[in-house]
Amino acid sequence: WENNDGAYGALYDAAHVGWRFPVQLLREPQSDVRDMAFSFYGPTCDDADHMAGPFLLPADTAAGDYIEIGMLGAYGCAMRTGFNGFGNGDTHVVTDEPMASLYMEETEATLSSNVVKL
């Protein structure tokens, strides 16, 4: 999803529950600068539109860079509101390997003994 979002949308859980979604900077060439902790602020004028993080990104991350925020899923999109006129933007679906797979070891798929194949 391409989205400039915040606490009143797909990043609700990051703001109000404190979830730290996995993030990565999308830039070519890749940055080789050391990571630092960032907080995110949403597009509204509301002080609750703040995601404390920390979200680790290269220290040279700047305005205008694209940041992929993983594991938002369908619920994040469904929770979007029109607060302060936001939330009605275009949605662009971009697919790749799920970010969660970056943190998993390669395993061989096996069929569990308690699974019935229909």
Question: Can you name each region flagged by the protein language model?
Answer:
Residues 1-118:
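Charged (often Lys/Glu-rich) extended helix/loop segments that serve as interaction or gating elements
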